């Protein structure tokens, strides 16, 4: 397995191009299952999860063509010949569950393995299944698989989600596009990635209104057609590199970054002593003074994103004073804490909250990544630490971040990937 070797203590300065959003691109690829025509996606991130999703779509019989030879522009199209999503692929990535709704809507049946992905709590799929049942699907669980049928097709219904689940919103949204009649999704998630999915689906001929309001209305259509769509910039990647500027006391220009996608993160950064400026095509982030402790609580959008919690905790570990981080979205999302403490951080976990008492400096140490976002929190700590940090199991990082070592090295970081 690959490792990163990081020698910390260097201020980062320079430009970093923010790639396409992982959490948008995966769902946009799945949307290709809703039409027999070609869906062309531009600004696709070159990450491991995209490779896994391509394998899954090809398993269903559709073609995923690399139009420019570098993975950045993909075309999805063709006939669905297989409605089973097998365990060996689905277990690698939780987003695989999102093929369930489109397969059911388009083919009237689907057999999808229960999902895998990051080891963050149980992350149940109950809301996906209950919502599809409300649309008329017949669903059973057998031997680790979801068996779903809609022999008479899906029919629009009013669905109230008990929690603003991103995945359930996306699955039901895509399924409803081809359902008969009108579907309403109440308490729908409002993330920018969902707005990006809606824009693409409407470009394919769907009739969806209510983006960003928490209540989506979908008028079903008989068929969708192809289109060309550009994937939005990755707000989590942008927020992560903003933390890199903050923790190293440097200045980065994050090309493609948008403050309007990162409101809660920008406010927390500014409260912590990091300056953030929106320029025409970029976000400029810099720190010149001391970091200050702040309290944050993860919440559904537009609240502070759970996918930024680990990175922000690394930043707070070297801030003056005490901070508290409360995780309300996922259980078991503090697995990075013991590794940060190995580097000299002072963090104590109490239930769903972590108390961080800032230290003057961190020390390099051998550490191990446990999930996608936690892996980057350890890189951030390594960039700020004295001495050498060796980060193992970086395959977690490769699932969601593109060209990490190259982007950081161009801005002055001493980071090297060692392949084994």
UniProtKB/Swiss-Prot annotation:
Active site: 118 (proton donor)
Gene name, Swiss-Prot/TrEMBL: murA
Catalytic activity: phosphoenolpyruvate + UDP-N-acetyl-alpha-D-glucosamine = UDP-N-acetyl-3-O-(1-carboxyvinyl)-alpha-D-glucosamine + phosphate
Keywords: Cell cycle, Cell division, Cell shape, Cell wall biogenesis/degradation, Cytoplasm, Peptidoglycan synthesis, Pyruvate, Transferase
Full protein name: UDP-N-acetylglucosamine 1-carboxyvinyltransferase
Membership in a protein family: Belongs to the EPSP synthase family. MurA subfamily.
Cytoplasm as UniProt keyword: yes
Residue numbers bearing the 2-(S-cysteinyl)pyruvic acid O-phosphothioketal modification: 118
One of the record's GO cellular component terms: cytoplasm
Compartment(s) where it occurs, according to its Swiss-Prot or TrEMBL record: Cytoplasm
GO biological process: cell division; cell wall organization; peptidoglycan biosynthetic process; regulation of cell shape; UDP-N-acetylgalactosamine biosynthetic process
InterPro entries, A to Z: Enolpyruvate_Tfrase_dom, Enolpyruvate_Tfrase_sf, MurA_subfamily, RNA3'P_cycl/enolpyr_Trfase_a/b, UDP_GlcNAc_COvinyl_MurA
């Amino acid at each position: 397995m690959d490792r990163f070797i990081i020698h910390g203590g260097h201020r980062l300065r320079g430009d970093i191009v923010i790639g396409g959003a992982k959490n948008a691109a995966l769902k946009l690829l799945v949307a290709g299952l809703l039409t027999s025509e070609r869906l062309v996606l531009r600004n696709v991130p070159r990450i491991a999860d995209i490779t896994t999703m391509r394998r899954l779509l090809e398993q269903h019989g559709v073609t995923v063509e690399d139009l420019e030879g570098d993975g950045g522009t993909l075309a999805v199209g063709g006939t669905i010949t297989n409605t089973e999503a097998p365990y060996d692929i689905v277990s690698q990535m939780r987003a695989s569950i999102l093929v369930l709704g489109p397969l059911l809507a388009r083919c009237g049946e689907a057999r999808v393995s229960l999902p895998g992905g990051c080891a963050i709590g149980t992350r149940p799929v109950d809301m996906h299944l209950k919502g599809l049942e409300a649309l008329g699907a017949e669903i059973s669980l057998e031997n680790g698989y979801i068996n779903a049928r809609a022999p008479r097709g899906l029919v629009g219904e009013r669905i109230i989600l008990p929690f603003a689940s991103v995945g359930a919103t996306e699955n039901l949204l895509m399924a409803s596009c081809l359902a008969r009649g009108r579907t309403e999704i109440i308490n729908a998630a409002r993330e920018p990635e969902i707005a990006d999915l809606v824009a693409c689906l409407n470009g394919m001929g769907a009739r969806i209104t209510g983006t960003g309001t928490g209540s989506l209305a979908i008028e079903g259509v008989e068929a969708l057609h192809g289109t060309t769509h550009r994937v939005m910039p990755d707000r989590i990647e942008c927020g992560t590199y903003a933390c890199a500027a903050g923790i190293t006391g440097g200045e980065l220009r994050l090309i493609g970054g948008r403050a309007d996608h990162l409101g809660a993160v920008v406010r927390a950064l500014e409260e912590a002593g990091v300056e953030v400026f929106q320029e025409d095509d970029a976000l400029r982030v810099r720190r010149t003074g001391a970091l200050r402790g702040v309290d944050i609580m993860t919440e559904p959008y537009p609240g502070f994103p759970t996918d930024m919690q680990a990175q922000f905790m690394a930043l707070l570990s070297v801030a003056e004073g005490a901070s508290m981080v409360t995780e309300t979205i996922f259980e078991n999302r503090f697995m990075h804490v013991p590794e940060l403490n190995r580097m000299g951080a002072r963090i104590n976990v109490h239930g769903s909250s972590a108390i961080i008492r800032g230290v003057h400096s961190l020390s390099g140490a051998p550490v191990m990544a446990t999930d996608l976002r936690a892996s980057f929190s350890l890189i951030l700590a390594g960039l700020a630490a004295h001495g050498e940090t060796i980060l193992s199991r970086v395959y977690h990082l490769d699932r969601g971040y593109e060209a990490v070592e190259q982007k950081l090295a161009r801005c002055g970081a001493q980071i090297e990937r060692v392949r084994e």
